[in-house]
């Protein structure tokens, strides 16, 4: 098979290699498509100790379950030959959080596509035993490129559930990448009175509005003040009741506190770079306005299932967020497209 090996920071080589060996308790996946996640991009451009060179990234795969080990424990609705997607957070299934259905918070979780599990920027990918329970069947007519958004969309859904939007709330989303786009759609579906979208990049904001503008009341480019003045002008100085920070930015994290209404809920969805994870935040904003500031990470099995329904019902709108598709041999162009801000969701099709 052919696979894309990350051989160094900003270096990738597509070459022939052996097909992954079938684990008796695992499976193999004939990859139809695999999305490039922001985590993949950060690893490609900065390196990550969990991805020792040479390494195959890719943790948003969909494809056909090609081989199934004789001792594999598959979900009841999955069998060999099925088209499936693979949820990326690999969990123990036994800790307190797994038992409560909060698999994203598993005390011993691992991430598919990182050591010790090579990813799916390849023609064939291994499904290790710990990942078989994460296989979820796809609707038969769902295109592979759209199906790759199942994993990040489920994460966006988790962020929206943590945000807990009330009927008529003003919702502000900072960051107009794929997550911000999908959260705008879901915020509207959940009864938000106003949905606002902001980004530091005009080009990315324009692409987002072309994709999901029907769910957005207004949008603007964030200036040096992080778009605080624009939001306050639109809310008569009150601020937003619900804010999602869907951009990995310390400035956005601070601006969110300034733009929050009293007793608002602010969710930090996007993680910061591992080498620079600390924000200088004005805690008096939190204190005097009685803000609830929360994090959101990953997705649960329940949210993966809800996502399948969303992808079936809102196909055209959600598909518009997938702006670029590249063959495996052009994966470097895919990473460059993300870094330049020239696209929203980028998909690799082996």
Where are these regions (language model features)?
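C-terminal hydrophobic helical "lid"/dimerization subdomain
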Residues: 1, 226, 254-258, 301-350
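N-terminal glycine-rich cofactor-binding segment
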Residues: 3-21, 38-67, 85-86, 106-116
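Glycine-rich beta-strand-centered segment in the early N-terminal region that forms part
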Residues: 20-34, 48-96, 139-141
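Mid-domain Rossmann-like dinucleotide-binding core that forms the NAD(H)/NADP(H) cofactor-binding site
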Residues: 81, 140-224
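NAD(P)H dinucleotide-binding glycine-rich loop of Rossmann-like/cofactor-binding domains
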Residues: 92-174
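Short amphipathic alpha-helix with an adjacent loop that forms part of the alpha/beta core around
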Residues: 226-237
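Glycine-rich phosphate-binding loop and adjacent beta-alpha segment
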Residues: 250-313, 350
């Amino acid at each position: 098979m052919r696979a894309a090996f990350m051989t160094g920071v900003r270096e990738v080589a597509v070459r022939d290699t052996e097909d992954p060996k079938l684990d008796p308790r695992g499976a193999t996946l004939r990859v139809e498509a695999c999305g490039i996640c922001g985590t993949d991009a950060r690893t490609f451009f900065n390196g990550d100790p969990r991805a020792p060179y040479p390494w195959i990234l890719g943790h948003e795969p969909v494809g056909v379950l090609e081989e199934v080990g004789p001792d594999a424990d598959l979900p009841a609705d999955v069998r060999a030959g099925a088209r499936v997607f693979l949820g990326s957070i690999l969990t123990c299934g036994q800790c307190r959080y797994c038992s409560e259905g909060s698999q994203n918070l598993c005390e011993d979780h691992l991430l598919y596509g990182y050591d010790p599990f090579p990813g799916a920027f390849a023609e064939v990918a291994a499904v290790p035993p710990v990942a078989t329970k994460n296989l979820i069947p796809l609707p038969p007519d769902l295109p592979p490129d759209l199906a790759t958004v199942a994993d990040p969309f489920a994460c966006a859904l988790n962020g929206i559930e943590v945000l807990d939007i009330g009927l008529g709330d003003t919702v502000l989303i900072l960051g107009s990448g794929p997550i911000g786009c999908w959260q705008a759609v879901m915020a509207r579906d959940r009864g938000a009175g106003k949905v606002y979208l902001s980004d530091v990049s005009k080009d990315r904001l324009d692409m987002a509005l072309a994709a999901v503008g029907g769910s957005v009341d207004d949008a603007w480019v964030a200036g040096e003040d992080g778009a605080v003045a624009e939001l306050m002008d639109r809310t008569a100085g009150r601020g937003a009741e619900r804010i999602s920070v869907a951009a990995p930015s310390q400035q956005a994290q601070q601006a969110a506190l300034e733009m929050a209404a009293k007793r608002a809920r602010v969710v930090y969805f996007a993680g910061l770079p591992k080498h620079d994870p600390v924000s200088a935040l004005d805690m008096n904003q939190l204190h005097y306005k009685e803000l609830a500031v929360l994090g959101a990470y990953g997705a649960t099995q329940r949210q993966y299932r809800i996502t399948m329904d969303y992808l079936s019902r809102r196909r055209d709108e959600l598909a518009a967020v997938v702006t670029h598709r590249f063959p495996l041999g052009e994966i470097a162009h895919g990473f460059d497209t993300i870094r330049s801000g020239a696209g929203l969701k980028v998909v690799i099709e082996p």
